[in-house]
Amino acid sequence: MKGLAIFITSLFVTMSVSAQTGVETDSIDTSAFDKYLNEIVIVAKKPGTVVKTDRKVYTVNQDLMSKASSASEVLNHIPSVEVDIDGNVSMRGNDNVTILINGKPSAMMAGKTRADALSQLSAANIERIEVIDNPTSEYRAEGGGGIINIIMRTDTKQGFNGSILANAGSVGRYNAGVNLNYGIRNLNFYGGYTFRRDRYDRTVDDYRISPSDTITQTTYGLGRPVSHTFRLGMTANITSADMLSVSGNYNRRNFKRDEYVDSRTRDLNGIVSDSYHRDRDADAKENMWEGTLQYTHRYGNSNEISIGYLYSSESEDELNRYTTMRQDVETRNNETVWDADYIHNANLRWQHALTDNIRLTSGYEFEHLRAEQNYHVSDWDGTSFIPNTDESNDFTHLRMVNSLYANADMTFGLWRVNAGLRGEYTDIDNQLKSISESRRKHYFDLFPSARVSRHIGDDIELSTGYSMRINRPQGSDMNPFTERINPLSLEAGNPDLKPERINTADFGIRWLSNAGSLTANLFYRHISDGITEVSRYIDNGILLTTKENLQTSHNAGVELVWNMRVTDWLDINLNGTGYYNRINASRLGFGGNREMFSWSGLLNADFTPIKHGTVQLNARYHSATLVPQGKRDGDFQLNLGLKYDIPSINLALFASVTDLLDTYKLSYTLDTPALKQKVEKRRNPRIIYVGLSWNFGGGSRKQHHNVEYDEEM
């Protein structure tokens, strides 16, 4: 951190400290200047990735591609995190990941539309992303793979200030946004608006072999989503010890989809025995609402009590119009899908320092989730559409979770110990309204967690941790009614699914220096009753995909994260993960254990070849990974970002190219005695954006006594 400046009315003091990528700096003692200073403003460029004892923190503002990208694209640039072509998020090979917004659950991240929500959440509105591999008991126990906490942008500057962002992309993509902030005395108001227009081109090749025939399907899809996002918030320092914050956001998205499927079935002699062509014309309207209220009271030395409430809802109303030509016979049918999630969350948190070295955190959390899934089909009889009650259903999933937790953080010399326990009582009610049936489940679990760390000198830290977590089935996973994807593909849930339970342990070493940091972690994960997707043939070559519980699975490996400032003009972040995965699939009838070693690599490199100019490279490779019925093939992606700053007018120019080499795809192979299937999905290549951002307004930040990074650098 160079050019650190402290400004006063008649005195100017310049200080210099190090802020290399991934290095945590010590606090700066300013007591010698206290009688002269009214306000301290410390300016520095944030490091892109900081690896802490219990988490990785990724500063989105330092990712050049974030200026035009969505949250899902930025997540793919973070160590430990992977996002596939369908928007599914995983960590270290485990896709049971909990995603929080500002530390709280969100309906946008709770249901089947999570991938769509991430693709429409503008990365420019994100402050930072925290990746927590092995959370403590203070966090809700959901998410066996870990927690991703997305922290949205806010500002605390006095006066009126803001920023404007605009981007234009290839094949009709556009996005733009404005963020405003107004701070006056102890009040701060902020708001923003974001517009996104995207285009998704998809090609899917599906090749299946059964004992009696082969099926070849090719799907061409085009999606054109348009979204509008509004956000508004306020923070009020009522007194020096009391703070109230209120915030809300609304997102509306219209999504048009066109799809064409060509399918051919051949017998064992290679003769076409069946074929069809299917056209899909779909319109979807999505609405997402969210509001939060939080009150915090601070007392004593670092003690506080807070109470909060959150309401979050997401709904999708979709109309699908299908026309199918099969053996020279045309059929038409309409499918309407209503998919909605409603979340109420209330929390009480108490933090109290028992001594100078022992801090206790405890709390209560209540969460109520209502998930609705209504699927109605009507068939054309030549004159009108007639409801098809055999293929229509209404399903509601209700889930209440009551949680109590206590967590102690203790320091003994060079040792730090964190230990906690969380208890969660879960009540689930699955309502099959079409047949007036209700299925209830309830259970109680205890989730312990512990972490011990020790410093060796100023540069090395050792840590080890353990936690137990759970992954509860989503409502759609337990809906037993069948949804027809196409004439030869069906999907259905499993009402008998059990929650999966995960035990995770890790051991890590972290080394810090003025030039960078190196972190190495060994991890082990044991999963009981793991929830997995299974495909099986039923009658007449129709493939049914559902969810089932595995017996056990084991995952063990090592992860390395290296942050290094190589020269004044080159910063590098390297991440490598290798792990061994073993699955016991005997419960599913696929034989005994299946096992595989997988690895992945991630490179983020920042070049500054000229003053005010930055070039950023992002490259990721992932080898083949294990699934219960086969494997997912490896993939590679290379991205490029460019930025040029014009400091005199607070303007920055950007350009980015996603998938520069047109190599990104998703393919998997299933291989069982009854089913052999190869699927390959590709998206539109080389997404290109050019854009600009402008920061405006002045005003100073509210007084702080800690190092504060300036967002405008």
Where on the chain are the PLM-derived regions?
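N-terminal periplasmic accessory domains that precede
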Residues: 39, 71-74, 114-117, 131, ...
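Short acidic/polar hinge/loop motifs at secondary-structure boundaries
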Residues: 71, 77, 105-133
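Surface-exposed extracellular loop regions of Gram-negative outer-membrane beta-barrel proteins
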Residues: 146, 150-161, 203-205, 227-232, 315, 427-429, 458-505, 524-545, ...
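Outer membrane beta-barrel strand-and-loop segments of large Gram-negative receptors
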Residues: 218, 334, 343-347, 389-392, ...
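Conserved C-terminal beta-signal and adjacent last beta-strands/turns
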Residues: 594-713
